Amino acid sequence: MSILKSSIQPNGLKEVSLGNSIGAFEKLLRDEYQRGNVVFELDTHFLIVVFMDSIIVKVNLLYNKVAQISFYNKFLGKFNDIGIGSTLGVFMDTYPTAEYDDDQNFFYIPNSTYENMAFFFENPYSFASDNKLEEITINDSSLLVICSNT
């Protein structure tokens, strides 16, 4: 199965998990690199690995741990039946306790095993558009954590 169709787990995707070292997904990285599906970028303290212009993995080089996994574009995987293209209405039906972070423009699910996930929608959310929940779709979703040395 293509990594683009993998289901999202609370801590990652396939061999790529938050807090793991790059060695944990070395085989996947090597296989996808040989197929021409991987691009590497360097940022301050981070190695950024881009799979098929649809999955971005940020590895904290100070700790050699995966700090963030983001899903975009052609990613077809789902997280509890929520994925790119899902509407805000379906998301809110599935997660009625979800909260919106006005400053960062994403939804998250507090006090749950999924609170490290952020769901970004195509337009900034506003209560004025609350009656148009079926018209607002997810355009990317990300697993976010802050790396520690533990």
Q: Regions from the language model: what does each represent?
A:
Residues 1-115, 120-150:
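Short helix/turn-capping signatures at newly exposed starts of structured segments
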